[in-house]
Swiss-Prot record:
The gene is abpB. ATP binds at A122, P123, T124, S125, M126, G127, K128, S129. Signal peptide: none annotated. This is Anti-bacteriophage protein B. Disruption phenotype: About 20% increase in T4 progeny; the phenotype is the same in a double abpA-abpB deletion. 10-fold increased survival following 3000 Gy ionizing radiation. Belongs to the helicase family. PROSITE patterns: HELICASE_ATP_BIND_1 (PS51192), HELICASE_CTER (PS51194). InterPro entries: DEAD/DEAH_box_helicase_dom, Helicase_ATP-bd, Helicase_C-like, P-loop_NTPase, RNA-DNA_Helicase. Keywords: Antiviral defense, ATP-binding, Helicase, Hydrolase, Nucleotide-binding, Stress response. GO terms for molecular function: ATP binding; helicase activity; hydrolase activity; nucleic acid binding. It comes from Escherichia coli (strain K12).
Length: 729
């Protein structure tokens, strides 16, 4: 059957092409379940070359029907028979008269509609989100939880659902929101699922990218049991299984999932290769570190590919290097627009992101401020940027429309990517209804098959290596006898409190013990630097830095800040806390970076700025508030033991780190795409309520549009309007 497929595929480009023979081969492949996917692939390729099938349009249409690609039946053909129209009516989605299911979507929708638990493993292009929207469109489900891997994807999902179902459902996506409706959809990361206590009586929960439930296998063959995001996702799964009537797990192609059945949750596992686009893959086999050969190959690809192209790179630094090389080779399009000027002013004109954007090339990476991520993706999808250079953010569900994908590196940071992740990146090429055939260019060899295409869920497969902080926070019903025994053994001596581990599940038991030991060894003078309730005590930052260096050193070291000695770390902490604003801190850091570079440091300004953006978002905004919350509880305990009666409350310091120097709550607007710099200008202009949630803040900005539209710049206004969904008159 493969031979029939290859011959037909090859013939499509030939001069003596016979459309009848091609469609005859398609029919043969579609008639055999073993070769059905190959037949469907040929149909997609035929639609990409419609002009070659003008003599046999009816046969082509019938083959489209036979392949189950009903959306193409609706979109690509005008002369539809009554029977064709009946098929389209049968496969029409409940949320839109204009959207039609393909056969696999309909199958999954039918399983879920009948109340079954479903685990779906399918390619990126299959259209998994349309199934969720259709379930909502039926109107029979009242409360749903959608668990997504990133805040960026939560925001993208929120926008889609708000537009389609905002009149019927309250869309909850931020910790500040209170549920006030009988009909609600929670769109949250796993950490936010675990923070909320109002997630009860759920009709259906969905976990997107369910493979993230499994601990990663390292190159050495060992399993990384310390990934706190995997732990948090398993805790969320346990919580949701307990309060939900049904679940739907989705992700890219894997072979099997293990662990759910041991927990007593029957489910239907569907693994399908149902693609709505065809993919052509070319491999170059260049060595990993041979940048010269890679850049040469990339130049050839850029010359040959005129359509929208995503280039996957292992890091923002490499993405910046590649962008500058594309510009040097003449593949940039010099652009002058207000957004480029805004970025130059607010960040720096020499920053890789600014230089790329000025030349019609987009950069997209995790530490990039949300508003710039959204703007870049919007411009790319609108066809205004030919190239989009991404890091692993491409895997996290950024919604893009690209004809071509170039995989420049087979790594994510310093980690090698496996065939599983490689395939996930490839799935970003092509787009149903836009690009029939996607082209993939792999500059290195394709990774070999590995066992990572099986997903083992730690919650269901509990062993000697299952982290105690995971076990402490899951539902008691989900603990195995073996885990209960381990659990009792760890907590028998009361050195570490169970309640503390449950409350701070981000941290491993060894980290709790480490912190306890540090406090026990502190003299009164050092310990007193931790006892305060508003303004940090003298020498607090010195002691805090010492604790960070022991507990979570990577939060600084992976972002270019040495943790030993702690002087540089203390300077960063002090610089951030004492700055008047986010902008002031960034500008100061850029000035320092320029000074280092002039003194011969090998780091570039872009590396320094990208590291600081990561520090602000990941370290200051996320990790350090968690460390402070844990410290506060442990300090209170030790203060009592030491006979200290003073009040201990770190709320003010935590807010200083996580709020970007904005009033309480206002930073929530950054998540929906309003830059922090713009928010500072709005704070100077308007009176924000301290008690308002993100919905109320958004409404307040809509109500005050007459004020801010006269007082702040054009680009700031564009960001606000995009975030709030305000269309210009």
């Amino acid at each position: 059957m493969t031979e029939i497929y290859e011959q037909a595929k090859h013939s499509l480009q030939g001069e003596d092409f016979s459309s009848f023979n091609y469609l005859f081969a398609v029919n043969k492949l579609l008639s055999n379940p073993v070769s059905y996917d190959l037949g469907r692939d040929l149909i997609v390729r035929a639609l990409d070359s419609r002009e070659r099938f003008s003599e046999h349009t009816t046969i082509l249409k019938n083959m489209v029907r036979k392949s189950g690609l009903f959306p193409y039946l609706k979109k690509e053909f005008t002369s539809l028979t009554p029977d064709d129209l009946r098929v389209l009516e049968l496969y029409r989605t409940p949320f839109s008269d204009g959207y039609v299911f393909h056969s696999m979507q309909f199958h999954i929708f039918d399983l879920l509609k009948s109340g079954q638990n479903v685990v779906l493993s399918a390619p990126t292009s299959m259209g998994k989100s349309a199934i969720v929207d259709s379930l909502l469109g039926m109107g029979t489900l009242k409360r749903l939880v959608l668990v997504v891997p990133t805040v960026a994807l939560a925001d993208e999902t929120r926008r889609r659902l708000q537009e389609r179902f905002g009149d019927r459902y309250q869309i909850i996506h931020h910790s500040s929101q209170v549920c006030h409706s009988d009909q609600a959809v929670y769109v949250l990361t796993q950490e936010r699922v675990n923070e909320r206590d109002d997630i009860v009586d759920i009709d259906l929960f969905v976990i997107d990218e369910f493979y993230k439930l499994a601990f990663r296998q390292l190159k050495s063959g060992d399993i990384d049991h310390q990934d706190e995001r995997v732990i948090e996702l398993n805790i969320a799964l346990s919580k949701l299984l307990k309060v939900s009537r049904q679940f739907y797990l989705t992700g890219p192609f894997v072979n099997s999932i293990r662990g759910l059945e041991k927990l007593g949750y029957p489910h239907t596992f569907v693994s399908t290769d149902f693609n709505t686009v065809a993919l052509d893959v070319k491999t170059f086999g260049i060595k990993a570190n041979d940048d010269k050969a890679k850049l040469k190959a990339l130049g050839e690809i850029a010359h040959a590919c005129v359509d929208a192209t995503i280039i996957y790179c292992k890091s923002p630094t490499v993405a910046g290097l590649v962008a500058r090389e594309l510009i040097r080779l003449g593949h940039g399009t010099p652009t002058e627009n207000p957004h480029v000027d805004w970025v130059s002013e607010e960040f720096d004109a020499d920053w890789d992101y600014t230089v790329a954007l000025r030349n019609g090339i987009g950069l997209h990476f995790g530490a990039l401020p949300r508003a710039l991520q959204q703007y870049t993706a919007d411009q790319f999808n609108a066809g205004k940027l030919r190239f989009l250079l991404c890091t692993s953010t491409i895997i996290e569900g950024v919604n893009t429309i690209a004809k071509n994908v170039v995989i420049y590196d087979n790594r994510d940071g310093t980690r090698s990517i496996d065939k599983f992740t490689h395939g996930n990146i490839k799935g970003r090429a092509g787009r149903m209804g836009v690009h029939f055939v996607g082209k993939i260019f792999c500059l290195e060899e394709i990774p070999e098959d590995n066992l990572n295409q099986e997903v083992d869920i730690p919650l269901g497969i509990q062993g000697i290596d299952t982290p105690i902080n995971l076990l402490a926070s899951v539902q008691p019903d989900h603990l195995s006898e073996f885990s209960q025994d381990r659990f009792d053994e760890v907590f028998i001596n009361d050195r570490v409190s169970i309640d503390l581990v449950k409350k701070h599940s981000y941290f491993r038991v060894e980290q709790f013990e480490m912190l306890q030991s540090m406090f026990e060894m502190m003299d009164d003078n050092e310990f007193s630097s931790l006892v305060f309730h508003w303004t940090p005590a003298t020498n607090f930052l010195k002691t805090f830095a010492k604790i960070i260096a022991r507990l979570v050193p990577h939060t600084f070291s992976r972002n270019g800040v040495p943790v030993k000695p702690t002087d540089v770390m203390i300077a960063k902490l002090a610089g951030y806390l004492s700055a008047e604003s986010y902008s002031e801190y960034l500008k100061n850091q850029i000035d320092y970076a320029r000074q280092w570079i002039s003194e011969g440091e090998k780091r570039t300004l872009s590396i320094a700025l990208n590291n600081d953006l990561k520090l602000i978002t990941n370290t200051f905004g996320y990790t350090l508030p968690k460390v402070l919350s844990l410290m506060e509880d442990v300090v209170k305990h030790h203060a009592v033991k030491r006979g200290i009666r003073s009040k201990v409350d770190y709320t003010h310091v935590k807010l200083a780190f996580e709020s970007f120097h904005l009033p309480p709550g206002v930073n929530a607007l950054e998540e929906i795409g309003i830059p922090i710099q713009t928010l500072h200008r709005l704070v100077d202009l308007l009176e924000f309520s301290d008690e308002a949630d993100v919905d109320e803040l958004s409404q307040y900005l809509r109500d005050t549009q007459d004020i801010w539209s006269r007082s702040i710049g054009y680009v700031d206004q564009m960001f606000i309007r995009r975030a709030l969904g305000i269309r210009r008159h």
